[in-house]
Amino acid sequence: MKQFAKRMVCLLTGILMVLAMLTGCSGTPKDEKSDSLVPSSTTEERGVLRIGMECAYAPFNWTQSTAEVANGDTAVPIYGTNDYAYGYDIMVAKLLAEELDMDLEIHKVEWSSIVLGMNAGDYDIILAGMSYSTERDQSVDFTEPYYVRDNVIIVNKEGAYANASGLSDFTGASCTTQIGTSWVHYVPQIPEVEQLTYYETTAEVVMAVSMGTADCGILDEPTALSATLANDNIAYIKLPAEDGFTVPEGTSLNICIAVKEGESALQKTLNDALVAISLDEEKMAELMNTAIEVQPLGD
């Protein structure tokens, strides 16, 4: 009888051990529980709007070492760095984030790889002073414009073209601009132009003109105005309609937010938010003027 009882105890103990092992392997799986803690890959469910921008294109966006801004606003931390980003793009991004009840995450990236980074999933959108073009529209989708710009020519105040007033006055000039932008399509409109190497950033374009490496450069008016405030050697010329640029086929003066191709839900969300924040021409001008006023000159 005692031997039988011992055998029963051993049997029950074994059964309990097996059940404990099965419970550990089944029930709520550990991996499944961990997965539930991982944020959704969709922008809205994650609650964070991840934005790619150069942070080197004042007054649209720039890098600064502190969060303080002269207008009392606060710059946004740049992901993975100790620096901060501010400018027109950040001001618009903050308005959108507030409207959407989302946090901002700014990713600093070189212009030449900015679309690749978004398509690789490094960030959700590009809000970086990017103009619409049919070529870009083949690889990304665009929102409605959040700014409309004019393009101008920058010159050295002491250079040969300082007194130019129309496009024809630049005949034979050497010209540069930023690579990968719609501005490269404007350079050939200068009669008998000498096309120079294009630069990675607008700051390099300004420096080339300031140093006399190039007779002139093509930028948008806000960037050119910022350049004149930061560099005493630079002036810019706004061309008259009768002797000025024509918008090249397939390009636009509209500055838009880019999303991954096919991200129609996010595109609509952003378009609705742009309407909600009432970003009309007057407000665009107000924000841009503020960005120009508070940019850190000489940085």
List where the protein language model places each region.
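Acidic, polar ligand-binding/catalytic clefts
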Residues: 94, 98, 103-169, 243-249
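Ligand-binding clefts/hinges and TM-proximal coupling segments of bilobed small-molecule sensing domains
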Residues: 27-32, 182-199, 237-238, 268-299
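Extracytoplasmic small-molecule ligand-binding "clamshell" domains
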Residues: 31-129
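C-terminal motif of bacterial Sec signal peptides marking the signal peptidase cleavage site
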Residues: 20-24
